[in-house]
Amino acid sequence: MKTVTLATCNLNQWAMDFKGNLERIIESINIAKSKGAKYRLGPELEICGYGCEDHFLEQDTMLHCWQSLAVILKDPELTKDILVDVGMPVLHKDVRYNCRVILLNQKIYLIQPKKAMAMDGNYREGRWFTPWIKPRVVETFYLPRIISQITGQDECQIGDAIISTLDTAISSETCEELFTPNSPHIQMGLDGVEIFTNGSGSHHQLRKLDTRVDLIRSATSKSGGIYLYSNQQGCDGSRLYYDGSCMIMINGDCVSQGSQFSLVDIEVITATVDLEDVRSVRASFMARCAQANLTKEFPRVRCPIQLTHIDYCHPPDRVIHINYNTPAEEIGFGPACWLWDYLRRSGLSGYFLPLSGGADSAATAAIIGIMCQLVILDVSKGNKQVLKDAQRITNSPEDYIPTDSREFASRLFFTAYLGSKNSSKETRDRAMEIAKDIGSVHKEVDIDDISQSFNDAFSQITKKQPQFRAHGGTPRENLALQNVQARTRMVLSYHLASLLLWEQGRPGSLLVLGSANCDESLRGYMTKYDCSSADINPIGGMSKIDLRSFIEWAGKFRDMKSILSVLTATPTAELEPITENYTQSDEIDMGMTYEELSIFGKLRKVNRCGPVSMFERLVADWAHLEPSVVAEKVKRFFYYYAINRHKLTTLTPSYHAEGYSPDDNRYDHRQFLYNSKWDVQFETIDKIVLRLSQRPQLKNTVNCPNQASLTQQ
């Protein structure tokens, strides 16, 4: 038995926070050493933070990274008898690389650049970094003076190499490289690498952890090996939440797993594993042995350290079951942790939410409620950083210990029902009950006088008085009167956020929360610069369908029963007068259901469908509808998407949660001025509809894969 103890971690790094990032790195190294680990792995670009974006182009960023590394190397205890693997950008021959830097006993042994850049979805690493495309090549890297004065080294090696210790071989692949078809671990495993490490900067997306785990399991189950995975965790300054989930696997089995969602800044996990288990699996797999025999050798960098324990007092850790959260739990915990990080790092004193009594604002309020519950839980576990942040945010004395989530919410969460004569008693009462259930300080405000002042100003200018549709007005008048109410709410929300703490005699101001869902943004069913315009939006990347499942879960399992009432309510903007014969409905106004919108959104972004390919897909999936009806639905969606696309350019920064997000910032790049007629696209759809109408026999066979087998029976 040859056991080794290895450590990996989740770190809540913050882009460009060099002081805080360094403190967390140092603490993680100390924790790893205290647990007896001989190898410590950290997240991708952990010294500066993964989300620096165009700050990577600044030489200052490089300077501060080397300064931080110098602090680590200067302390003789930090790297004594432990391999420390840190992530940082490195400039080599005036080319910028995303690198792993391997330290031991105050020396740098290897700088290993990333070979494959993440360039899809939210990632654009190729904008800042160049991949190392020289397989099995190492070069001389000349160390900056700030480092050589400490290490006594003028140079070290940089490139595609393997670390050889006295008893095993180690190499790394970084984040995206795990997801590529020809991952580095394949060839390196065949060349004798037994321990693979992956310092990652992987953000949360619903159900993404399943993919990550499957890839790590596959990396070690096919031909044996030990795999360490590290990740950032938290909001590092943007729309993304890095969801941790550090883990250690051996031969396809998990032996240690960290949290996916947490308020803890530093989480270090370790596992003791037996190298002989890897060697036994590999040596008995003869097909693998034959391929290994043909593998071209990698350069090796020798490190004078023995990782294995010299006694029999360190038995291997047992296999554990991997913990997964349900999608509803992910919607609750991910944005809640993101909101806490955003609040504590913003320097502000709480959140303000316009609470309408509808599903979207109820879901947003519930996420704040869960955030408060997580704070209480962490404080009860002795998390000193969370307690310190809670006291500072709420301007509470040092002896204040939050023990009740509703009481804590009352110190930092403010809501208001911004009603009008078009609002119903049901939504007003519902908003009050939800606020009470969560614990917010709740206000009720009527906006009629404010909105009317705009209409009066218009009448004074034009000598005309616009009317609602219900009172004989034209569609233009009706829309303008709705929009002025919506925009009034936005201005009033910011005014309240600025002064509600002043009303209580407390310092600070509040962040304004938006609560527009992904579907409505995509359809453009919102007023530009209304309550959808806010500081941040925790639900802007989620569909109404996903939010409804979250509301059901939160109502049943997070002690928020009042929000369940929104599930049976008809979604309505309540911007038009309610009459005996008319009550405004979102789905009627939009001309499509939320279920349909969710499908359109996924096909448009995830499946990359234009109008024609979307119609071809749906005419099969919706075989119960006439092709002409499907065509009309698809055309209507793309028409409204085109005329409202400009609204997406001003969307409030939203938590990224799903692949169907319409986020205009860097995820869904498209023009914002369209020909809404879609002449060629719609003509092509019409031709397909005509062909289908001339072949009616196809109607009964579309989307019936089991029809042949049923006929045979």
UniProtKB/Swiss-Prot annotation:
GO biological process, one term: NAD biosynthetic process
Annotated metabolic or biological route of this protein: Cofactor biosynthesis; NAD(+) biosynthesis; NAD(+) from deamido-NAD(+) (L-Gln route): step 1/1
Catalytic reactions of this protein: deamido-NAD(+) + L-glutamine + ATP + H2O = L-glutamate + AMP + diphosphate + NAD(+) + H(+)
EC number: 6.3.5.1
Pfam family, one: NAD_synthase
One GO molecular-function entry: ATP binding
A GO CC term assigned to this protein in UniProt: cytoplasm
Residues that, per the record, bind ATP: P354, L355, S356, G357, G358, A359, D360, S361
Residue numbers annotated as active site: E44 (proton acceptor), K114 (for glutaminase activity), C175 (nucleophile), S356
Chain segments carrying region Ligase: 324-703
Record keywords: ATP-binding, Ligase, NAD, Nucleotide-binding
Span of domain CN hydrolase: 4-275
UniProt xrefs under InterPro entries: C-N_Hydrolase, C-N_Hydrolase_sf, Gln-dep_NAD_synthase, NAD/GMP_synthase, NAD_synthase, Rossmann-like_a/b/a_fold
Family: In the C-terminal section; belongs to the NAD synthetase family.
Alphabetized PANTHER family for the sequence: GLUTAMINE-DEPENDENT NAD(+) SYNTHETASE, NH 3 /GLUTAMINE-DEPENDENT NAD + SYNTHETASE
Protein name, per record: Glutamine-dependent NAD(+) synthetase
